[in-house]
Amino acid sequence: MNFIDEFRDKESILALKKLIEQELKNPINIMEICGGHTHSIMKYALPSILPKETNFIHGPGCPVCVMPRVRIDTAIKLASMKDTIFCTLGDLLRVPGSEISLLDLRAKGADVRALYSPLEVLEIAKQNLNKNIIFFAIGFETTTPMSALLLQKVIEEKINNVFFHINHITVPAPVEAIMNDENVKINAFLGPSHVSVITGYGIYEPLAAKFKTPIAVSGFEPVDILESVLNIIKQSNEGTFKVYNQYKRAVSKEGNVKAQNLVKKYFRVCDFEFRGLGLIKDGGLELKEEFSAYDASKKFDCTVQSKNESKACICGQILRGLAKPYDCKVFGKACTPRSPIGSCMVSGEGACAAYYKYSKVNA
């Protein structure tokens, strides 16, 4: 048996299903913060085996999805500059801006590169000394340490043609913003997995206490998620509001302190605009003033005029937990992974992409 098999074991899944059915006394709304959890929930069809009173609500845990259009347009402007190589991670290239996407811009001849690791920037910079290398850094606490490490190496190696546009965001701030929204009815949270490896699960304890809401930090496998749901239901029955660490094989209370200290060395918190949630206090990170020489937003003109989002797209409501992909009139029709209208259909962690991939709409 492979290590992961025990977390997909059919008998364990059915036993947990039975326990959940026995424990559930009232309808419960559980928001999974992480986009990876959304995909696991849909991939393993967990809603279909759980009581209908168990409702999963999809949260703002996809960094590409929550990136506002103004920042996409800024990326496109930077990538359009002469003598520039624009580098970033993941699905950002396919997110529509006001006019085009970064992928469209690359098709027109711009040097836009999707990286597997931020550290690839070092070789790109050394091989292109006559060009400006812009690293458009995105992601929650999971990817921030790699951006910090890249900056550290750029400084150590005295590389002067690399500039950072920082779009890193934090998990607790948008969760708090959602809980402060009286239109959102959430009884509990599935805490993120990979983020918690870095931050530790202790970071969520103030949220659980403030909003009297159970939080279960969960792994990605079906047994992980069902164990977390069972704990949440038991906490709800008992009237307790604790952070439960189901993902003990990877997450500790303190997290990766070395990575945290590296981030603190180069970054400071700042307000950040999230798609669908608006400007959130302390929701993002920016370079500290002493590293402003590496800040693309200070080195180059980043002012843009962005157009409003398509009225047909409800990504903003989905990210706030007020709607699901099926509520969108263009889902699976005008909006598909091949021709996405909204960011939730673009990203591999987006709720719409998960529904499209694993639900009957694509059968």
Language-model region placement:
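A short secondary-structure junction signal
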Residues: 145-149, 176-178, 200-203, 227-229
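Metallocofactor- and cofactor-centric catalytic cores in central/energy metabolism, strongly enriched
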Residues: 1-130, 144, 152-157, 165, ...
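Short, conserved secondary-structure transition motifs
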Residues: 168-175, 255-258
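Internal helical hairpin/lid segments
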Residues: 227-317
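A conserved active-site cap/scaffold subdomain adjacent to cofactor or substrate pockets
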Residues: 165, 183-249
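Generic beta-sheet signal
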Residues: 89, 115, 136, 165-167, ...
